Regions:
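Claisen-condensing/thiolase-fold acyl-transfer catalytic domains that form or cleave C-C bonds
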Residues: 1-131
Length: 131
């Protein structure tokens, strides 16, 4: 389970409490809901409920795709992952304009791609460099 490994490596035990933002590959609405659950941000079968509750809105418990995600911001195939990392960078450096979160510490960027017979997925925990 990719998310579990990534969280363990980053020292994250409760992603909803410890992450400040998430950028995920929402190429289709159902993909976003499934990823809430796969990334352990929602319990199995409850991603849709969490989405409707506002849990993942800008002012919710864990803001997800506050730049609009792939469906609203755009899906530059081959560069979507870079765009997600860039949005995280903007947030961590206070340069996200109207989308700016108060004081983000850690974020998660998720991307996927490929074909039905060959697929790849990547998860990165990112944050503002300290020191």
């Amino acid at each position: 389970h990719l998310a579990k490994i990534c969280y363990e490596q980053a020292g994250i035990t409760d992603p909803v409490e410890q992450l400040s933002l998430v950028e995920l590959h929402d190429c289709f609405t159902i993909t976003e809901i499934v990823l809430y659950e796969d990334l352990m941000l929602s319990k199995r079968g409850e991603g849709w409920k969490d989405a409707l509750s506002g849990k993942f809105s800008k002012d919710g418990k864990l803001p997800v795709n506050i730049d609009g995600g792939l469906k609203a911001f755009g899906h530059p195939i081959g560069a979507s992952g870079i765009r997600m990392i860039y949005e995280s960078w903007l947030q961590f450096h206070g340069k996200a304009g109207e989308r700016q979160l108060a004081d983000p510490k850690l974020g998660l960027a998720h991307n996927l791609g490929g074909y039905p017979w060959e697929n790849v997925s990547a998860v990165a925990i990112v944050g503002k460099e300290l020191g």
